[in-house]
Amino acid sequence: MSPSQIEASVIHELQETGIAVVQLTDIVPHVIFSDIQAWAEAQLQSPETQERITNIEDGGRPRAKGGKYYIVKPLGDVPVVEVEAAVMGASLSEPILRIVCGYLGMFSRLAAVDLWLNVATPGPDEFSQKWHRDPEDRAIIKTFLYLRDVDEANGPFCYVPGTHRPGPIGQKIGRYNYPDDGVVEKRFPPALRKVCTGKAGTLVFCDTTGFHKGGHPTAGARFVFNAVYTTNGAEPLAKGQRLFHLKGARSSLKSPAARYAVGLLGD
């Protein structure tokens, strides 16, 4: 099926700028966002997760994969998600996959999903809170679904439009994925950056080969569901691995694109 008018608009915006911001229910009208919110909030209620949140709020720096102590991952380092979960229904919905596949120009793989609570911390930006770009593939679509309202103080996702690999602004700043501090700010003043504040239910599509950062709240917290869509050439899919486990029968997915998305090389 051809993309709808709004889907085609998102694809075009991604091609031109590398980023598009919409409301989830405008793209996937049948999804009940409150069901996704309720599921996500329930994941935060375990004693271990609550203890970790309190630890960070009290100034602690608990051990974390990659050193990102400020991110609470209630699903663990390798998330396990039910195929029937409402959030997977959205992530593997035909409208979202039409957008992703339309942008990538091929069927895509769902390489990773995760639930992040970014807790407010003092001090300068660290790790992915700094400007960077993702090297895993020549084009990568990440979606960030805001599960709570996100304002300037909650660590909104930030992007430099046009710096994605296919975009009009070549990536010539530094040799590495993390430029030196201040380089991006000097080259791209605030007027050339996009700060993605938004209400709960906001869905950010972005090609993260472009410069981006986020997730450093100075007050409150940022709660998002993140999904990563790539080609077969991305790490770790090229090695026959995926960064999450899907619980349930893949055969229950009706869409060929959805079944392909959760498969691996050789399936």
Where are the model-predicted features located?
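Non-heme Fe(II)-dependent double-stranded beta-helix
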Residues: 1-16, 23-129
